[in-house]
UniProtKB/Swiss-Prot annotation:
It is an enzyme of class 2 (transferase). It holds the Pfam family CofC. It comes from Archaeoglobus profundus (strain DSM 5631 / JCM 9629 / NBRC 100127 / Av18). One of its GO terms (biological process) is F420-0 metabolic process. It comes from the Archaea. This is 2-phospho-L-lactate guanylyltransferase. The gene is cofC.
Length: 206
């Protein structure tokens, strides 16, 4: 299986800029990518990181493509292709095994806010359409092509990290992950209240 992982190494995750400096966001994005790659490490996949800028990571094939995400992905779909986002660090090999074994011409793991966090494409007629509630758009497109579409249900796969609120989920569930360790190292902690909150106790920001 071909696995494509989109990645933005330069000035990523701008919605986290209120709680992280630019260099911290870049390091954090890399840690999340490494968590995703760790989850994939036990599978015999052809992994390609589709990066918006030149970027090196040992033992992996990085392809630089500055086009819009849809174009960068659709031009590389071949045979059985999975697209896995680089900002879902809570996934693990057990989740991926269930995902890869799911039946269907198209298998979609939705994000919590209507996005598409993972997708398997087994029919080349299908093309990705990211953003603008891509989960529903992908369902509708598969239906229009008369393709069997399976929705893959996984909480951990649904947690993509974009906003400060998302960081709380990672700090609650992500112990042992590189991205969790990075957040902890720069002072993020959980404040135990009736509704847990995320606080930063060191390396005062900004």
């Amino acid at each position: 299986m071909l696995v494509l992982i989109p990645f933005k190494p330069v000035n990523p995750k701008t919605r986290l800029s209120k709680v992280m400096r630019k260099n911290e966001r870049e390091n954090f994005a890399r840690c999340m990518l490494l968590d995703v790659l760790d989850a994939l490490s036990s599978f015999d996949c052809d992994i390609k990181i589709i990066s918006t800028h030149p970027f090196k990571i040992e033992s992996y094939d990085v392809v630089v493509d500055s086009r819009e995400l849809d174009d960068a992905i659709n031009s590389r779909i071949e045979g059985e292709t999975a697209v896995i986002m680089s900002d879902i660090p809570l996934i693990n090999s057990r989740i991926l095994r269930r995902f890869f074994e799911s039946e269907g011409d198209v298998v979609i793991a939705p994000g919590r806010k209507g996005g598409t966090n993972m997708i398997i494409i087994r029919d080349r007629k299908f093309k990705v359409r990211y953003y603008y509630c891509s989960f529903l758009r992908h369902l509708e497109f598969a239906k229009s092509l008369d393709l069997k579409c399976t929705v893959f249900d996984s909480f951990y796969a649904s947690v993509d990290i974009d906003t400060p609120d998302d960081l709380l989920e990672l700090m609650i569930h992500g112990e042992g992950k590189k991205s969790y360790e990075f957040l902890y190292s720069i002072g993020f902690r959980i404040k135990y209240e009736k509704e847990p909150k995320l606080v930063r106790i060191s390396n005062t920001f900004p």
